Amino acid sequence: MRLQCTFRKRMNKCLLLRVSLLLSLLCICAHVYVELKGLCLTAAVRLQKQTPNRRHQKAVTRTPLADAASTCCRPLKHHRRIHRWKIDLEPWAAETHDLQEEADRFLRYISTPQVSCERPASALPVFDREDHGSWVLCLDRRFSLAERIESKHCRVYSLRLGVEDDGLERLLAGSGCEVHCFDPSIRGAHLQDAHMWLHRLSVDWRDPNPAVPAQRLHSGTKKLAAILNDFGHRQVDVLKVDLESAEWKILENLILEQVLDSIGLLLLELHLHWAGFEVGGDEPSVVRYWFSLLRELERAHFRLYHSYSDPTKPRLFLHRNLRNTSSSFVLGWVNTQFVPQG
């Protein structure tokens, strides 16, 4: 009898334990279910809140196109210019990579105009070649400069180091052109003389070094693309560059940042007695680099119309007398695809 009672008690305890475990399991399942359901509801609410905003954004995006569809013209598309990292070097003039071969090709190239510029009969006599020396403009009616000067809508940039010859700048300013001269050696920060503005600003091929305090700089330093942007100028009819051996790196920067499209006429003084600022490599590589830069101009639709070898300069080509070549040339390039705006 006692054994039966003991057995029943043990059975009841086991049954109660099983029931307790079962109830605990059910509670856990119910809790998990409630939590999951709550998460699903929260996600659904968030999705509903975000959906109207997305629809609104799409509607706003479509609005300009819808407005443009009611007009005759498509909206203007602004394409961001993609800057290049380096220029395309031309093949060597000869397999031997010889300086003489490179120099002959280069000198032949800069001495052979690619287009002729006829001076229109209506042009002022002051624009004759004899009156402003080596800096010759292209006033051919096939291009835009003559008309821009006559309408007094021309803009001129002159990049220089010290005032040696500003006759062309003053001539263009006197003809009604808007002339900006950038020279770090002038006294005042910004000076104006009739249609001629003088800016104490150095045009560089690099951005200013942030480690150098502005107080230590005698003049500001900017790239030409930044100056155009700051001044709100989209185009320049004439760009004159006389930077005493910095012209190579400046030209490279104009090519890489695609500023050439904004220039109608390029007047460039070359200094050949040494490689130039920050131009590295052996002598054949230097001349190949020079030639490649000018070929980049040609690919940008510029054509050489004027070449002047200065007879008063030393006969030096990379520190040596090479074919009695002058160390200084002035080249004139016209952008055959330049279309003035405004």
Q: Which functions belong to the PLM regions below?
A:
Residues 2-342:
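Phosphate/nucleotide-binding beta-alpha loop and adjacent structural elements of enzyme active sites
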